[in-house]
């Protein structure tokens, strides 16, 4: 009754037919035509190299966790026992780190890093229409000029989509000689602040914020005025995560 196997088989067959119709031998080759990795063999070689490098460390970590748990672990057990081991060995947990990461301080640090890296200044603008009182609006300034803006919607609330993401509100473009500057949405689901207290983030939250801001900067700092290739547009899917992971590094240093 709940077996999706026939549906998946039909999707696979239709994708294969789609690829054949436009001259590719299989759907993998078709999907990679617009990626940095140009062939399935490139992808497999990359994955095999990653496995070769990572497997010894993963096996050692799993053995350590199983020794701690005193039993064999299934995949769904690993996160739970990793957190328990961390608490026992280092007396630390994500929750214990919250007092060190109030959101105002994290934003100040993030904006400071961005300023030093890219020579810009991020300034909040008041009086902009927003869809919820928690939402804030910021301009990015460079050489006394605004070059882009973004909405920041940081907190979880009822009926809000879960997760964290960046999306483009307006892409940079120039039509008829008039330049339109980029605007982005930066959305997270952090624990809301208590009364008269700032929101306190876990370190995982901090990494998430830096990650999504990397996507935002990719969109907002573009100097290209053609919509199809400005910012995140026209970038291969296997390259689009580069700015976000680059920014994550600064959440650790």
Language model features by range: what are they?
Residues 1-9:
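A short, flexible low-complexity segment enriched in Lys/Arg and Gly/Pro that occurs
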Residues 9, 14, 18-192, 240, ...:
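Active-site-proximal, well-structured secondary-structure segments within enzyme catalytic domains
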Residues 222-247:
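The catalytic-center signature of Zn2+-dependent metalloproteases
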Residues 2, 189, 195:
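Short, motif-level signal for alpha-helix interfacial/capping segments enriched in acidic residues
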Residues 4, 99, 103, 198-206, ...:
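Alpha-helix N-cap/helix-initiation motif
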Residues 16-23, 114, 192, 197-223, ...:
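Active-site recognition of the HExxH zinc-binding catalytic motif
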Residues 130, 198, 235-239:
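Short glycine-biased active-site loop of nucleotidyltransferases that positions the nucleotide triphosphate
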Residues 119-125, 218, 224-230:
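Acidic/polar loop patches that form or flank catalytic/metal-binding clefts of enzymes
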């Amino acid at each position: 009754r709940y077996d999706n196997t026939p549906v998946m088989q039909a999707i696979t067959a239709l994708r294969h037919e789609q690829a054949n119709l436009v001259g590719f031998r299989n759907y993998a080759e078709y999907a990679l035509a617009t990626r940095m990795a140009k062939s399935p063999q490139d992808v497999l070689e990359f994955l095999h190299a990653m496995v070769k490098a990572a497997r010894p460390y993963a096996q050692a970590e799993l053995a350590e966790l199983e020794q701690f748990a005193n039993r064999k672990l299934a995949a769904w057990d690993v996160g739970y026992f990793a957190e328990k081991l961390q608490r026992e060995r280092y007396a630390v947990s994500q929750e214990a780190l919250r007092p060190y990461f109030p959101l105002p301080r994290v934003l100040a640090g993030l904006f400071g890093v961005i300023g030093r890296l890219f020579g810009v200044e991020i300034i909040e603008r008041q009086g902009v229409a927003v869809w919820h009182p928690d939402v804030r609006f910021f301009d990015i300034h460079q050489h006394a000029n605004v070059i882009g803006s973004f909405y920041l919607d940081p907190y979880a609330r009822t009926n809000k989509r879960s997760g964290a993401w960046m999306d483009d509100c307006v892409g940079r473009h120039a039509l008829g000689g008039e330049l339109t500057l980029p605007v982005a949405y930066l959305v997270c689901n952090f624990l809301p602040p208590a009364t008269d207290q700032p929101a306190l983030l876990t370190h995982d939250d901090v990494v998430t914020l830096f990650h999504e801001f990397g996507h935002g900067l990719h969109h907002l700092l573009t100097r290209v005025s053609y919509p199809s290739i400005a910012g995140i547009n026209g970038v291969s899917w296997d390259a689009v995560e580069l700015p976000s992971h680059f920014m994550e590094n600064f959440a650790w240093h």
